[in-house]
C-alpha cells in the first residue's frame, strides 16, 4: 500500500532517414514530453550500438564507466567484466590519449574472449585524434562538445555573427572526420554536454545556462545531420539537478520543434556516494523518467562502478508497468515554466510557505509510545543532566503523532500535529495543532487560530474545498496520492491550486510499505524531487509504514531538499 497537464497525442511525420518524428504543429510552449498526466515514453529513434539498441521500442538501458587506468589492460578488463556481470549493458572506458584509444583494441579482444558481448564506449575529451582511433575499434564514442575542438581560455568577448560563424566552421573542420569514420564503421556517438565545461564561445553568447548546454550539443548535431549521420545519443549532464532537469527538458522541446528524435542518455554528474549520491541521482534522473524521458541511464557514484548498476536498475524498473496507472485528469493550461525554477506563490502559515524553506514533518503516529528518545532520530538530542534539548542541523520542524499525546516538554523549534479529535483534548498545549480530513474541515469542526493541517488527494479538490482553503489564512495542505503515477497526480493537484489562485501552502506527503532501505531512498527521491525542482512544495512528509528506520527517513527527507537545492542542511 502506497498512500498518503496533459495534452492529446502528437501528429507524426517522417524525415529522410525513414524515422518517425514528432510534428511541431501542436507544440505547446511548455512541451517537453508526451503528457504531464499520462505516463508515456517519448518516442525516439532506435540507435544500434553493437548487439543492443537504445531508443525506439528498446527498454531503458543501464550503463556505467570504468575507473581503472585504461593502459592497465588486465585491471580494465576485470572491472568491465564485473560491471557486465552486475547487469551493465554498455561499458564506457576513458580514452584521454591516442595511446589509450589504441589499447581499447586489446581490452575489447580480451572481454570478447571471456564471452562477454556488451558494447564498449570510448570517452573522449580534448583529443580528436584519440576519438578517430577509438571510433574504428569500439561500438560507440562519447564526445564533449565543450572541449572536443576548443581549449578553455576563459576569454570574455563579444562574438559578431561573422566571427561566430567562423568558429562554427572551425569546429566543422575538426569534427567532420570523426563523423565520417563513425558512419563508415557503423559506430554510434553520444554528444554529451557537461554544464561545467561549456566552451568560451557558448558561455559568451548564451551564458552558463540550459540554453547554452542545448546549443552546444546542437552545434555538433547539425554537423552530423549535414553528413546524414544519425546514430546519435544526446546528454545534458550537470551536478546541479535543477539545471540538469531544465536542460534535458529544453533539449527535448527544441528537438520537438525541429522534428528530431534522438535518444537520451540520463545522468547527474558527480552525484556523490552513499545515500547522498543515490538521492541526488534519483531526484534528477527520476524527474525525467517520470515524464517518459530517457533511453539509457548512468548513475554516477563515487563507488566502484559495479555498485552503480543496481541503483540504475532500481530507478528504471519502476516504469515497467507504469502505463497501467489510473487515469489523471488532463490539464488545459500548464501554469508553470518547466525550463526555469520559480517557487509557487503560497501564503505564510507560521514557518511554512512564502519565503520559508520547505519544512520536514516526521511521522511518529505508528509508534507504541512517544518519549524523548523518539525524537533522537529526528535531529533532537535530550540531555538528562542538563535537562535541555540539543538541536542538530537536520532536525524536523513538525511531528505528526496521530492519536498519541506527549507528556514531556517538547523542543522549542518543534511543532506537534495530532488527529483532530485528540487535539481537542490537548488544544491548550503550546505548539500543538490539529490534522483534518476534508469532511471534518468543511464540516465546521473547531480550528486552531494559527495552523490547521488538512489532508487532500486530487479527487478531493472540488470548488467548495478550494474556496474554503483560499479563504483560510491558517490552512496548510498535506497532499497524498493513491495513483501508481503518483508524482504526476500530485503535480496535477498543485497545478489546480495555481490555476485557481489558491495560495495555501502544500506539504508533499508520500507513504511507503515494506520495501528495502535503498528502495525507500530512491522512490521517495523520485516521487518528491521533481515537484521540488519545479518549486511546487513547501514541505515534505515521508510515512514509513514498516517503521524502525526513522533516522534513514529523516536523512532522506533532508537529503531530498538538499539535492533539489531548496534547503541546505549540510
What do these predicted regions represent?
Residues 10, 15-19:
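Intrinsic-disorder-associated, low-complexity terminal segments enriched in Asp/Asn/His/Tyr and depleted
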Residues 48, 53, 61-64, 92-94, ...:
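Structured core elements
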Residues 35-36, 41, 73, 84, ...:
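Active-site beta->alpha loop and helix N-cap motifs at the rims of alpha/beta catalytic domains
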Residues 48-63, 68-87, 91, 97-100:
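N-terminal glycine-rich anion-binding loops that anchor highly charged ligand groups
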Residues 54, 59-60, 67-69, 148, ...:
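Short, glycine-/Ser/Thr-/acidic-enriched flexible segments
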Amino acid at each position: 500500500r502506497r498512500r498518503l497537464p496533459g495534452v492529446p497525442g502528437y501528429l507524426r511525420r517522417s524525415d529522410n532517414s525513414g524515422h518517425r518524428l514528432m510534428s511541431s504543429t501542436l507544440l505547446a510552449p511548455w512541451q517537453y514530453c508526451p503528457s504531464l498526466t499520462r505516463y508515456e515514453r517519448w518516442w525516439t529513434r532506435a540507435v544500434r550500438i553493437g548487439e543492443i539498441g537504445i531508443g525506439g521500442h528498446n527498454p531503458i538501458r543501464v550503463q556505467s564507466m570504468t575507473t581503472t587506468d585504461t593502459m592497465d589492460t588486465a585491471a580494465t578488463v576485470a572491472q568491465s567484466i564485473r560491471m557486465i556481470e552486475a547487469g551493465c549493458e554498455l561499458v564506457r572506458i576513458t580514452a584521454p590519449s591516442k595511446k589509450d584509444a589504441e589499447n581499447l583494441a586489446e581490452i575489447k579482444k580480451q572481454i570478447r574472449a571471456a564471452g562477454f558481448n556488451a558494447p564498449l564506449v570510448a570517452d573522449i575529451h580534448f583529443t580528436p585524434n584519440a576519438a578517430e582511433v577509438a571510433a574504428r575499434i569500439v561500438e560507440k564514442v562519447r564526445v564533449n562538445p565543450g572541449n572536443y575542438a576548443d581549449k578553455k581560455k576563459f576569454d570574455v568577448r563579444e562574438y559578431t555573427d561573422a566571427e561566430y560563424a567562423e568558429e562554427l566552421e572551425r569546429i566543422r573542420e575538426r569534427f567532420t572526420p570523426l563523423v565520417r569514420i563513425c558512419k563508415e564503421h557503423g559506430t554510434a556517438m553520444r554528444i554529451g554536454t557537461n554544464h561545467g565545461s561549456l566552451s568560451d564561445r557558448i558561455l559568451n553568447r548564451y551564458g552558463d545556462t540550459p540554453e547554452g548546454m542545448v546549443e552546444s550539443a546542437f552545434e555538433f548535431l547539425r554537423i552530423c545531420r549535414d553528413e546524414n549521420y544519425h546514430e546519435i545519443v544526446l546528454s545534458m549532464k550537470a551536478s546541479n539537478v535543477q539545471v540538469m532537469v531544465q536542460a534535458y527538458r529544453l533539449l527535448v522541446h527544441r528537438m520537438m520543434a525541429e522534428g528530431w528524435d534522438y535518444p537520451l542518455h540520463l545522468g547527474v554528474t558527480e552525484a556523490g556516494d552513499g545515500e547522498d549520491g543515490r538521492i541526488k541521482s534519483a531526484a534528477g534522473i527520476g524527474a525525467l523518467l517520470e515524464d517518459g524521458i530517457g533511453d539509457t541511464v548512468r548513475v554516477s557514484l563515487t563507488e566502484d562502478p559495479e555498485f552503480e548498476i543496481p541503483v540504475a536498475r532500481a530507478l528504471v524498473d519502476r516504469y515497467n508497468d507504469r502505463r497501467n496507472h489510473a487515469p489523471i485528469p488532463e490539464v488545459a493550461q500548464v501554469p508553470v515554466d518547466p525550463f526555469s525554477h520559480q517557487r509557487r506563490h503560497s501564503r505564510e502559515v507560521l514557518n511554512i510557505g512564502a519565503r520559508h524553506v520547505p519544512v520536514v514533518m516526521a511521522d511518529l503516529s505508528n509508534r507504541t509510545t512517544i518519549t524523548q528518545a523518539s525524537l533522537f532520530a529526528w535531529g533532537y538530542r535530550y540531555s538528562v543532566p542538563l535537562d535541555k534539548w540539543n538541536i542538530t542541523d537536520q532536525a524536523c520542524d513538525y511531528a505528526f503523532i496521530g492519536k498519541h499525546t506527549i507528556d514531556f516538554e517538547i523542543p522549542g523549534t518543534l511543532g506537534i500535529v495530532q488527529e483532530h479529535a485528540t487535539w481537542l483534548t490537548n488544544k491548550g498545549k503550546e505548539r500543538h495543532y490539529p490534522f483534518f480530513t476534508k469532511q471534518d474541515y468543511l464540516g465546521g469542526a473547531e480550528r486552531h487560530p494559527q495552523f490547521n493541517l488538512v489532508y487532500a488527494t486530487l479527487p478531493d479538490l472540488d470548488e467548495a474545498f478550494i474556496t474554503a482553503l483560499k479563504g483560510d489564512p491558517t490552512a496548510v495542505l498535506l497532499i497524498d496520492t493513491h495513483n501508481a503515477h503518483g508524482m504526476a497526480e500530485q503535480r496535477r493537484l498543485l497545478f489546480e491550486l495555481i490555476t485557481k489562485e489558491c495560495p495555501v501552502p502544500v506539504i508533499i506527503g508520500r507513504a511507503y510499505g515494506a520495501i528495502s532501505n535503498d528502495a525507500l531512498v530512491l522512490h521517495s527521491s523520485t516521487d518528491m524531487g521533481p515537484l521540488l525542482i519545479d518549486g511546487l512544495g513547501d514541505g515534505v512528509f515521508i510515512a514509513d509504514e514498516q517503521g524502525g528506520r526513522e533516522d534513514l527517513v529523516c536523512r532522506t527527507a533532508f537529503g531530498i531538499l538538499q539535492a533539489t537545492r531548496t534547503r541546505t542542511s549540510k
